């Protein structure tokens, strides 16, 4: 009787958790290495798997949205992240947001309960031999990062991610805010803080002159647009925030029946509804400055901060030079990478890459050929993008319809067109799963 093969998975974030889950459920043994809690990163607070260190939102759910399509694909692939997200969802209008603590706890418990997963709480300092999935994320420890750099023979690439502050609901002045989702989509899920032009001017001036926290030695000023600090956005011009997180369109104040000059939105952060985060307010301001400046927002004058915003480094590889669409390295086929390190950007994007990498690592362990997911699925399109775009100008990429093949028929309405792309993707993923991915253990 042949022995059961084993795959190493390094890192138990979103990508590593998905990789371990899928490998184990394909009948392959997993050694899952996670250095927390013995060694923490600058952004993590717990030892839980799949800890959400930025927002608690997994973004839109609708099939007309690229993030909605990706989540639908993940559900078809039996994603542990999506299972936990749906069990621990909190109100968020048309989006899917979660109670971050119970979400991570369920994923940790589910993976820990698998009989063929061995969890090893120690830091890995060099790339191990054997079939391995590296999913150490944007905050990879320095020793392993050096090993990866030496393997790839390239310089590090890094940029900033920033996390928004979290507030207590009972400290918000509810007389000054109102409950509403933009354009009244879904349930009324956001607390909205309306601003007059005069209030906005005071806030804007305070924000652009606020003192930022000192960056760590390993950080520089690169900023990825998807998680831009609010103070950096403000410095790009007075109007910039009004087209971003302070956009008032579709958020008429029920007291006046009119659209405010600006609106700051608060989104529920926990299942109990006791905590809210300030939407789009990722920041690197000093904590005292956050208290001073954000208390200028109507309704937040006396707010209690349970966690101030923080900023941390993100690291990613030049995947077009290094990886194949199976997430294998070109020079060592038994070494896979997954997660934000590959250049997919975002929670669900990272988790989805873990599904693909984990599936292919398990296939390799079982003596099967790794497979490329169809490019007309979002998972396949992302894998294709990060391995086929220009290496010299490579930047992280969120899920979006622009990286997917166009429809054969022309549909003028954008929402209808995107929905049709999504329906095609889900149909093709079903066929691919049934005809290509089925493994008889």
Curated annotation (Swiss-Prot):
It catalyses: uridine(54) in tRNA + (6R)-5,10-methylene-5,6,7,8-tetrahydrofolate + NADH + H(+) = 5-methyluridine(54) in tRNA + (6S)-5,6,7,8-tetrahydrofolate + NAD(+); uridine(54) in tRNA + (6R)-5,10-methylene-5,6,7,8-tetrahydrofolate + NADPH + H(+) = 5-methyluridine(54) in tRNA + (6S)-5,6,7,8-tetrahydrofolate + NADP(+). FAD binds at residues 11-16. It is found in: Cytoplasm. The keyword NADP applies. The keyword DNA-binding does not apply. Pfam families: GIDA. Keywords: Cytoplasm, FAD, Flavoprotein, Methyltransferase, NAD, NADP, Transferase, tRNA processing. One of its GO terms (molecular function) is tRNA (uracil(54)-C5)-methyltransferase activity, 5,10-methylenetetrahydrofolate-dependent. Its cofactor is FAD. InterPro entries: FAD/NAD-bd_sf (IPR036188), MnmG-rel (IPR002218), MnmG-rel_CS (IPR020595), MnmG_N (IPR040131), TrmFO (IPR004417). It comes from the Bacteria. GO terms for cellular component: cytosol. GO terms for biological process: tRNA methylation; tRNA wobble uridine modification. Its EC number is 2.1.1.74. Catalyzes the folate-dependent formation of 5-methyl-uridine at position 54 (M-5-U54) in all tRNAs. Belongs to the MnmG family. TrmFO subfamily. This is Methylenetetrahydrofolate--tRNA-(uracil-5-)-methyltransferase TrmFO. It comes from Lactiplantibacillus plantarum (strain ATCC BAA-793 / NCIMB 8826 / WCFS1). The gene is trmFO.
């Amino acid at each position: 009787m042949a022995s059961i093969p084993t795959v190493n998975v390094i890192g138990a974030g979103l990508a590593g958790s998905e990789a371990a889950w899928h490998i184990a459920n394909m009948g392959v043994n997993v050694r899952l290495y996670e250095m927390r809690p013995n060694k923490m990163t600058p952004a993590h607070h717990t030892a839980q798997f799949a800890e959400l260190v930025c927002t608690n939102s997994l973004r839109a759910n609708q099939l007309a949205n690229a993030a909605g399509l990706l989540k639908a694909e993940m559900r078809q692939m039996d994603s542990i992240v999506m299972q936990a997200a749906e069990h621990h969802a909190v109100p968020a209008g048309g989006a899917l947001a979660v109670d971050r603590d119970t979400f991570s706890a369920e994923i940790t418990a589910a993976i820990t309960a698998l009989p063929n997963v061995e969890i090893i709480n120690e830091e890995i300092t060099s790339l191990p031999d054997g079939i391995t999935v590296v999913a150490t994320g944007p905050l990879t420890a320095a020793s392993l990062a050096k090993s990866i750099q030496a393997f790839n023979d390239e310089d590090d690439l890094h940029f900033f991610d920033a996390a928004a502050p979290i507030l207590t609901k009972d400290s918000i002045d509810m007389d000054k805010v109102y409950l509403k989702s933009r354009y009244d989509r879904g349930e009324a899920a956001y607390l909205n803080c309306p601003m007059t032009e005069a209030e906005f001017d005071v806030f804007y001036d305070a924000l652009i002159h606020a003192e930022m926290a000192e960056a760590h030695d390993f950080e520089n000023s690169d900023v990825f647009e998807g998680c831009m600090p609010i103070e950096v956005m403000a410095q790009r011009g007075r109007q910039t925030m009004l087209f971003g997180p302070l956009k008032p369109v579709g958020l008429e104040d029920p007291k006046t029946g009119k659209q405010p000059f600006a609106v700051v939105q608060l989104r529920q952060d926990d299942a109990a509804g006791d905590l809210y985060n300030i939407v789009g307010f990722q920041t690197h301001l000093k904590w005292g400055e956050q208290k001073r400046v954000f208390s200028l927002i109507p309704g937040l004058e006396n707010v209690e901060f349970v966690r101030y915003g923080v900023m941390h480094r993100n690291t990613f590889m030049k995947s077009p030079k290094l990886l194949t669409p199976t997430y294998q390295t070109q020079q060592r086929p038994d070494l896979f990478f997954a997660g934000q390190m590959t250049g997919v950007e975002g929670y669900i994007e990272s988790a989805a890459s873990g599904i693909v990498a984990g599936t292919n690592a398990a296939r390799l362990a079982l003596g099967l050929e790794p497979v490329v997911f169809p490019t007309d699925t979002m998972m396949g399109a992302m894998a294709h993008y990060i391995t086929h775009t220009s290496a010299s100008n490579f930047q992280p990429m969120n899920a979006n319809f622009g990286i997917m093949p166009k429809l054969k028929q022309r549909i003028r309405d954008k929402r209808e067109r995107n929905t049709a792309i999504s329906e095609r993707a889900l149909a093709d993923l079903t066929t691919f799963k049934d005809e290509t991915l089925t493994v008889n253990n």
